[in-house]
């Protein structure tokens, strides 16, 4: 298979693996709020990236990366989905600057992904979250010897799993519930899916009962202080920065994530006043793809 075919296949494998584990990832979701939608949101996010590059074998890997990253920004859903899209954007930006997808640059690409996510998260938490998986992957690659992407992901998969185990103890929410972080679990599954695909290990991995030392169903936790998970896309009409928009929105909610490219800005936040959040964002451009979920209602449904 060509490098481009491998990339397209790896994207599909990531989506298939998430889809196979969607319900279980949903059940792990306790941070930042227990709204049980991490698996669902990651599936929608990654499906956008996989669909965008399907049957695009004529493109080079860096072009495919850029295309999938842009699509994932548009399809991103939820806190975890928007963060994953920011990680992909940072990864893609690094490889695009090089002009080629180079295995020796994978550690630096993970570092670029980490920086991209940190720029768009108002208050990044490095321990016990998806970011801890990125850090572990970056660090492991920086001290390992490999010459191919296949070899790199055979190193990354166990490193991510080891880092995932630790997330059970790093956050109060996951400690109390006895689970690993759902977003971190999602990224770990994605990395494992790429490893399985490149190594031709067979079908995407599903979480089985024997693995519940890592993944244990929890009792739902108290709901967030904010009622609404609010998301929308801003169609840029000027050069106002994402940083300025993030600053405005941080006054009306929490879990604020603002990430953009040259055409759009994707906004995610938890708030009690979605209308105010949209009002503050409207000077940056027209709003589209508006989505508002009542997290208090979701949390109550999870208690039943």
Where are these regions (language model features)?
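N-terminal loops that bind phosphate or other acidic moieties
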Residues: 1-304
């Amino acid at each position: 298979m060509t490098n481009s075919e491998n990339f397209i296949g790896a994207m599909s494998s990531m989506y298939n693996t998430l889809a196979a584990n969607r319900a279980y990832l949903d059940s792990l979701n306790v941070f930042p709020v227990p709204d049980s939608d991490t698996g669902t949101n990651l599936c929608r996010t990654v499906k956008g990236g996989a669909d965008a590059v399907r049957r695009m074998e004529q493109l080079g890997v860096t072009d495919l990366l850029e295309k999938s990253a842009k699509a994932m920004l548009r399809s991103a859903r939820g806190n975890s989905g928007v963060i994953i899209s920011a990680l992909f954007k940072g990864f893609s930006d690094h490889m695009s600057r090089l002009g080629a997808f180079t295995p020796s640059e994978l550690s630096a690409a993970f570092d670029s992904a980490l920086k991209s996510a940190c720029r768009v998260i108002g208050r990044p938490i490095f321990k016990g979250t998806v970011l801890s998986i990125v850090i572990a992957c970056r660090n492991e690659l920086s001290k390992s010897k490999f010459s191919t992407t296949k070899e790199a992901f055979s190193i990354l998969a166990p490193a991510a799993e080891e880092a995932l185990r630790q997330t059970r103890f790093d956050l109060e929410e996951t400690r109390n519930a006895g689970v690993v972080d759902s977003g971190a679990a999602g990224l770990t599954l994605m990395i494992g899916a790429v490893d399985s695909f490149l190594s031709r290990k067979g079908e995407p991995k599903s979480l089985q009962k024997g693995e519940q030392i890592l993944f244990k169903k929890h009792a739902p936790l108290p709901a967030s202080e904010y009622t609404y998970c609010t998301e929308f896309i801003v169609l840029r009409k000027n050069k106002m920065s994402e940083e300025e928009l993030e600053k405005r929105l941080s006054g009306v909610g929490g879990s604020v994530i603002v990430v953009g490219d040259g055409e759009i800005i994707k906004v995610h936040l938890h708030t009690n006043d979605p209308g105010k959040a949209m009002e503050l964002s409207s000077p940056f451009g027209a709003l589209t793809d508006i989505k508002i979920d009542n997290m208090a209602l979701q949390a109550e449904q999870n208690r039943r």
